[in-house]
Each structure stands twice: as structure tokens, then as C-alpha cells.
Amino acid sequence: MLDLPPFIAPQHYTDADAALAQVRRIYDNSVAHLREAMRRYVADADESPVVRRARACYPLVRVRTDSANRLGNANPVSLSYGFVAGPGRFETTLTRPDLYADYYLEQFKLLLQNHGVELEVSTSTQPMPVHFSFDEHEHLEGTLSPARRALLRDRFDLPDLASMDDGIANGSHEPAPGEPQPLALFTAPRVDYSLHRLRHYTGTTPEWFQNFVLFTNYQFYIDEFVRLGHAEMANPYSEYTAFVEPGNVVTRRAGLPTEAVDAFGAMPPRLPQMPAYHLMRADRTGITMVNIGVGPANAKNITDHIAVLRPHAWVMLGHCAGLRNSQQLGDYVLAHGYVREDHVLDEELPLWVPIPALAEIQQALEKAVADVTQLAGADLKRILRTGTVASTDNRNWELLPGNQPQRRFSQSRAVALDMESATIAANGFRFRVPYGTLLCVSDKPLHGEIKLPGMANHFYRERVDQHLRIGIRAIELLRQNGMDQLHSRKLRSFAEVAFQ
């Protein structure tokens, strides 16, 4: 027997704010229902003789269109999202309207503007896993005995992987006859799953993440970012409002009052696997920096989850092996192509799919190098090389017999090699998140220059500060150029979903 909250039938809206308010109402009712049922279960206070399964479902938004054309007041040249691909019925489940309010509101407004149709909002038939209904600081299930915990599956819906795969993003999803077409890349359970994973891997809650993300594979960059973040907080005129570190430790800008949420922050006893740091702006266009560690598995893992936040761009700042003898230690490499020997995305994104360079990101990175180094023309080209970056899953590729990798890298015209950049770019392509890569040459193993401890430490001290300032400057340029220019139509498929 099911214990359900009241079902809310479809209601039609031509006002985006009203539609969002209804989404909130349905979501809040579902969450409250599951939390109360869990509290009764933990307290063993359910006196009903009949075993009742508590269930609540996510809100749903739907649009129906009769034409492939968009309204005359829409500019089809500038649009890369906000419209459906043709006539039909399109829908998606939604979650966390508190976190996604601005995002949902923009998507709703664009659909109304581009198609002139009504938005239908109702309760869906997709159950909400009880784990995804808990508040950030609630851990009710932790007090359950092993026997009671084993019975959870009989009383509540648990996460179901079948409802959260990436078929839509991968382009392999085929609706059955009579089923609606997707309106977004991610279903609500998939989003909730990643939001919970982000807490685990980064040590910070999703609310702190900003819309521009820098990835690095060295703690040296994080140390410098932390120093810069605290310096910004000491400046009462900084454009940034807060700096957040793992454990949700919040430092507010000088002159700003603390907020209630700050009291929950505490430095963790040890850093999480991929710690994240957030230099925040009031409009969420600040900078999040994540130390992803080493290897393509980490790179795929973190980008799989950050993608549900729909950032405006992510950029890899890391070290690489220079493959050309003409390169010097400390030179920069701006990737305009990738050799994917990482193998972690082969099933989701076939190797025959090219990963294009995105002009908006490339131009911002090149200008940032020029701005920070104060070089131009031939002097700039001397330290900045544009070319193909190869990424491998074999850290000791140099030891393979017969010069096998060297031959492939030469045939591909690669100028640099690392273990993460191609993965981050490929997942950006797969998830329609604008991406870029700017690496710094830290060794040249094909030419006898390998990393040694003393040399490496000196090199890091010399270059990390400048490289990070280049990355931050690139983000500033992207922000100044506007988000409308950033989301490239190069990332759209033939039958793209409407949501960004």
C-alpha cells in the first residue's frame, strides 16, 4: 500500500515565475512527505498494521508544439538553447528549485518567448529516492539499526540507476512510441545523484559552486588560489563576496556580515579526494577551482557531476610533457585538438567524434596569456604554442617498448601530453559545457629533460602564480564577453534538448 502526498494535476502557465512557483510547491510537498515518513520510521512510530510504502514524486514540466518554427521575435542566429527541435511533446523532471531557480526561470522564459506555448507543470510519476529528500545536515538513517536499515527498501524508494543514465547526453536515447521527448540533458534523479556525489568528492555543498570552473592536477595551484582568495576577502572593494573552502568554511569579504549558514562550516580532518574552492560573486559568475588529482578517471568522475550544475565554462590548467625539442620548460600550450588515449569515455563518446576547439574560449585564453605576460607578436608565440594535446591513461608511457606511443604522438602532430585534458574537453563536448585547456610544460621526457625534485620545486614556484593569474584573467574575459556568446552552437546535436 502506498502512502502518497496529494497528486497535483497539470496546470498551464504563460508566466515563467508562476510556473516556477508551482514547481517549488510540488517539490516542497514531496520532500516534506518523505522527511516526515522517514522520521516516523526512525522513531518506529508508524502504528498502522498495514505496511505502507512512502512515496513522493518529482515535479515535471512539459511543453507541446505543433511547429518546428520559432516565433518571429526570436533570433535563431544567436540561440544555442531555449527552443525545441521540432513539433511534439517534450518534458523533464525537475529537482532542487531552491538551487536551480535562476536556471529554471531562464529556460521557462526562453520556451515561452521562442514558441508561445503554455508550460504544463504537474506531479510526475518518477519517484524521488528518500536519500535525496534529506536536508544537508540531516542524517536520520544513521541512527537505524542494521535490521531496520535493511527494511528501508520495503518502505521507501531508493536510488534507481535505470532512471539516471546518460543516454540523453550521449545521444543514444530513443523514446518509445508514445513517450515524450526529453526537454533537458539530465533527469531529476540524475541531478540529485550528482549533487550528492559533489559533496562527497569535493567537500563542499553544490550551493557554493560558481558558473566558471578551473581544474588543476597540482596542489601548488590550489595553494596559490587560496592565498588569492583570502587576499580578495581582505579587500572591501573586491568584486567577490565570499571564499569557500572544503568543509564549507566560509570567509566573507571585509565589511560583509556573516550569514547563518557560515556556522555549519568546519575544516575537515583530511582533505576530500578532489577538494573544491569557490571564489564567489553575487551573481554566481565567480570561480570554482578543483584539484582533480592525477588521471582520466578522476577527470571524468568530477566532470560527470559538475555538469549537472550547467556551468558556463570549464578550463583545465595543469602541467604537461612537452613533446617538441623547441619547447622550453615553462612554455604554455593552448590545446586546439586532442588525442584521446584516456579510454574512460570511449563507450559514451566514440573516438571518431572530433572534439573541436571553441573560438570563444581559445581567444580568451590567448588574450589572457598576452595580458599577464605583457608579450605580443613573435615574443608571445615564443612562449605560447597552439597545437594538439594527447592524453593517456598510462602514467609511465615512456617505458613502453618499441617507441610505440612516440610514433603515434608524432603522427598526430601532438605538442604536449598529459592525463586529463582530453577527458575534460571530451566531457565538456558531451555535456555541452564550453571547455578549454591551457597547459604548462614541466618536463620533456622525449628529449632527456625529466622531472627531478629540486628542479620541479623551483619550476613550480616560478610558474604557478603566473599560470593561475592567466586562468583567472581568461575567466574575467569570458565573463565580460557575455554568456550569450559563450554557449556555442558547435555543441548542439541535430535534435538538441531545449534546456541549456
Q: PLM features: residue spans?
A:
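Accessory terminal and edge-of-domain segments that mediate assembly/interaction
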Residues: 1-313, 321-500
